[in-house]
Amino acid sequence: MNRYAKVAVLVGLMATASACTRIETGEVGVRRSFDKTIETSELMPGTINQTMWGDVLTFPTKDVQVDVSDLTPLASDNSTVDDFDMAVIYSINPGSVAELFIEKNRGFHAETEQGDTLLMYNYIRQLGRNAAYKVARRYESLKMADNRAEIEQAVRQEIVASLAAEKLDGQIDVSQVLVRQIKPADNIVASANALVQAQNEQKRKQVEVQTAKLEAERIAALNA
């Protein structure tokens, strides 16, 4: 093989290698042809796929975190929570990636800075938001923090029920909900502090009255 042939082969190999996409662990690929048609079969982790004709879209499918922040739900005492933040962790069934991408509204998905598509990210965010507002109505504002674990479980159950109602429970698995912050409104905290202060003041006065009564009884006994 002469020098020019070797160079041509080397260039060809380099071009072939550069025109490939490897599907990493925790993600699934879907091929998009040069005419933008999406193939319905998934490309699984570990596979290396050529992209000389068309390209390969990659979708993270495992433990995707959706941050649902700055919520202001209404509590059972009709007070508005000043700030409620949580995270929803979900995974996509690898065998459902192509179907969800093709059939669901593109507004349900989100794009990462790296160019990956987070399937159903915006949809899960909305379900989480709705669930948080619904569950918050079961608790008094000042008691939410003490019931954080219970609220997390209840919000997750609401999301799972919503997915089941849309027949998506076999395609999307919500594994966890984490409540990051529950901040009652300032006026509710101030009222609670004022109440505690008033109760403490009342107890102090009761002690003073009881002490004075005992002292009077002692003096009366000495003078008897």
Tell me what each language-model feature is.
Residues V9-M14:
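Hydrophobic helical h-region of N-terminal Sec-dependent signal peptides
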Residues T25, G29-V30, V88, D146-E158, ...:
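Short, well-ordered alpha-helical segments
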Residues N78, D83, G115-I188:
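Amphipathic, coiled-coil-like alpha-helical scaffolding segments used for oligomerization/assembly
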Residues N187-A224:
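Long, charge-rich amphipathic alpha-helical coiled-coil "stalk/tentacle" segments
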Residues T16-A19:
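C-terminal motif of bacterial Sec signal peptides marking the signal peptidase cleavage site
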Residues T21-A131:
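Hydrophobic membrane-anchoring helix/hairpin
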Residues M1-A8:
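Bacterial N-terminal signal peptides that target proteins for export
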